A protein has these predicted regions:
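Short beta-strand-to-loop acidic/aromatic patch adjacent to the donor-nucleotide binding site
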Residues: 21-34
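Short glycine/serine/threonine-enriched helix-capping/active-site loop
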Residues: 28, 55-63, 158, 166
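Glycine-rich, basic loop-to-helix element that forms the pyrophosphate-binding segment
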Residues: 1-19, 42
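Short, flexible, basic/aromatic active-site loop/helix in glycosyltransferases
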Residues: 77-110
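Acidic metal-phosphate-binding loop of nucleotide-sugar-dependent transferases
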Residues: 3, 32-34, 135
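Conserved donor NDP-sugar-binding/catalytic core segment of glycosyltransferases
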Residues: 33-84
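Active-site-adjacent helix/loop segment of glycosyltransferases
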Residues: 151-248, 253-260
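A short, conserved alpha-helix in the catalytic core of glycosyltransferases
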Residues: 103-162
Length: 278
């Protein structure tokens, strides 16, 4: 049975916690990641030093283009005011060459860390409610990092540590199913974690932006991706109440770190900016 990213790691971490009850840290590492020599030490030392740190990632570089950042996390994940995730070194499908532009400071607070290679504080992981298995694949780590943030934990990127990631291994880089999950899950984590008024405002704006994205897919002769966007919205509306009115008593809040107070869609598609800094 394929439990997905969330289900697989949740099961593994429950077993590990039971066997090693005093374990402090664990690394979620995808099978298509190639760590570099010495990558682990700076992550572990930082976690030991900073008790408020819930999760940390290394730089994620492209296995096929070693001088470039890789899609899944690059130099640390951010979120724009419309709820679109992007990363330092990666906006939508465009990735930057790693020229050391994000190397200083060595540790930077971000909003979300890459699930491809993610060191977590085990206690924070369980305190935050584990990975949400309803998301199955794509953006589960963003949801987890958001909930860690709500519990008072910080998320960081360590640029003195790096790994290479092949990417697109589960569903493929241009899979319509990946498009479906990305659009649906990004909406679900907003209504789940953002204050209700903020979430409703964002969803209203996303109707326009996602429709524009669908039109772009059609213009590019990718009708299956347009259908995926439409399916994503119908699925989101069906699951809305389940996520918006969760039985948990967890507070909802907008991110404190790693938030870009602008529209990444506007800057990328209209202003043609391929790199966006906070």
């Amino acid at each position: 049975q394929n439990l997905g990213y969330s289900g697989g790691y949740n099961r593994a971490l429950r077993i590990i916690k039971e066997k090693y009850p005093h374990l402090q840290f664990s690394v979620l590492l995808n099978s298509d990641v190639e760590p570099q020599e010495g990558w682990l030490d700076p992550l572990e030392k930082r976690m030991e030093k900073e008790a408020s740190l819930g999760a940390i990632q290394p730089k994620i570089l492209d296995f096929h283009k070693p001088n470039n950042f890789e899609y899944a996390g690059a130099a640390g994940g951010l979120l724009d005011k419309c709820g679109y995730p992007f990363a330092r070194g990666r906006v939508f499908d465009d990735t930057e060459e790693d020229k050391g532009q994000y190397d200083y400071p060595e540790f930077s607070k971000i909003f979300w860390a890459s699930g491809a290679c993610l060191m977590i504080r085990v206690s924070a992981f369980f305190e935050s409610g584990l990975l949400d298995e309803r998301l199955f694949a794509h953006m589960e780590e963003i949801d987890l990092c958001w909930r860690m943030n709500l519990k008072g934990y910080d998320i960081e990127c360590c640029t003195s540590s790096s790994v290479f990631h092949v990417g697109g291994g589960t569903l493929g880089a241009i899979s319509p199913q990946k498009t479906y999950l990305n659009f649906r899950n990004s909406l679900l984590i907003i209504v789940k974690n953002a204050p209700t008024i903020v979430a409703l405002r964002i969803i209203s704006g996303r109707l326009f932006f996602d429709a524009a994205a669908g039109a772009l897919f059609l213009f590019r002769r990718q009708p299956q991706h347009l259908i995926s966007v439409i399916k994503a919205h119908f699925s989101f509306y069906k699951m809305f109440s389940e996520f918006a009115f969760s039985p948990s008593n967890q507070k909802k809040s907008w991110p404190k770190h790693g938030l870009y107070n602008g529209s990444v869609v506007w800057n990328y598609f209209i202003r043609k900016k391929e790199n966006i800094n906070l």
